[in-house]
Amino acid sequence: IKAGANLINDTWAGHDPELLEVAGAHGMGYVCSHTGGALPRTNPVRVRYDDVVDDVISETGKLAQRAVDAGVPEDRILIDPTHDFGKNTYHGLELLRRCNELVATGWPVLMALSNKDFVGETLDRPVEQRVPGTLAATAHAAAAGVAVFRSHQVSETLDVCRMTLAISGDFAPLHPVRGLV
């Protein structure tokens, strides 16, 4: 906080309740993540959900309400399905396939897709070869209305988001001259 941070990205889904209190007391933003009940720094196996998207919506919604109750400003709350945390590759793909349902909750959605295991397992690629898969996933999520992306490839991710928004008519080309002058 002293260094200027204004957002807490709680990747462990409220496991440490003091983070909510700190965010509320200081008017900070808060990212409500979903880990499927996984404890911090664990890597669960054979994770099962009746419906992973419904579970993410339910749990992040509850955490968002806890954040509001702790004093976090509603306009500073985001939800994050938290790909790879308490989820397998099939869950990650389902969350992307149905990310419009997350957007429909009304909470801004954050996704951290960069170089994730679900990308590597889907394409059978090591971490250093996951950029194309990451950018494809990002384009899909951006087209569905995901608001924020955490990325290792910032410039490329920005270009993908801008191009996706330009295709949908929600972003004006930065330098349109061909055939216009």
Positions of PLM-derived features:
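Active-site-adjacent loop and "lid" segments of alpha/beta metabolic enzymes
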Residues: 2, 6-66, 86-181
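Short strand-loop junctions, especially beta-strand C-caps/beta-turns
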Residues: 82-84
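Phosphate/pyrophosphate-binding loops at sites that engage ATP/ADP/AMP, CoA/4′-phosphopantetheine
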Residues: 63-76
